């Protein structure tokens, strides 16, 4: 009771506690950003729009995130493909292995900026029932966040 009274008197907020204890759950929740938890650089799985389905599967398997992004002939990110997209495409087509990435990618994907709090990213993924988020800076893909990675951090 004395500690709470003192905290109230000094206007001590959760953010102040987080700064003093950045490794704790509250600290991580209030301080870690998308930039801190994202996979970036060569670790981001990317395929060209005209790559065959087998190449898409290979890329997703090699990177182990469960998703790959799709870029067009101008190297602009135009979509993403998840494990689920692959399963749905196989279920709908007898010619899946003749398909290219653009045939079964999701053009509308959810993204966040690199400064978005990791806890907010986790909330977005839970609300939208998705396992990953693109991290975009303008039109540039700078990273990808996997829900499992955030949960492992204790956020």
Q: Residue locations for each model-derived region?
A:
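The conserved cystathionine-beta-synthase
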Residues: 46-64, 71, 90, 111-130, ...
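A cytosolic small-molecule/anion-sensing beta-strand core signal
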Residues: 72-73, 82, 105, 137
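Cyclic nucleotide-binding regulatory module and flanking cytosolic helices
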Residues: 13-38
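Short alpha-helices
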Residues: 1-12
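Short hydrophobic beta-strand motif reused across regulatory alpha/beta modules
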Residues: 79-82, 131, 136, 143-148
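A short, polar/charged loop-to-alpha-helix boundary motif
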Residues: 85-99, 149-155
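Bateman (tandem CBS) regulatory domains
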Residues: 30-44, 98-109
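Terminal peptide-recognition signature
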Residues: 2, 37, 60, 75, ...
């Amino acid at each position: 009771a004395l500690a709470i009274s003192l905290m109230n008197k000094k206007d001590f907020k959760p953010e102040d506690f987080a700064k003093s204890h950045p490794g704790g759950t509250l600290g991580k929740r209030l301080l870690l950003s998308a930039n801190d938890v994202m996979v970036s650089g060569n670790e981001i799985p990317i395929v060209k729009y005209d790559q065959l389905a087998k190449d898409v599967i290979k890329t997703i398997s090699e990177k182990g995130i469960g998703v790959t992004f799709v870029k067009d002939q101008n190297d602009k990110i135009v979509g993403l493909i998840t494990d689920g997209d692959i399963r749905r495409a196989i279920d709908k087509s007898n010619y899946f292995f003749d398909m290219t990435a653009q045939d079964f990618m999701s053009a509308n994907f959810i993204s966040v900026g690199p400064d978005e709090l990791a806890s907010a990213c986790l909330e977005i993924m839970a609300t939208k029932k998705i396992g990953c988020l693109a991290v975009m800076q303008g039109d540039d893909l700078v990273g990808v966040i996997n829900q499992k990675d955030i949960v492992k951090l204790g956020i």
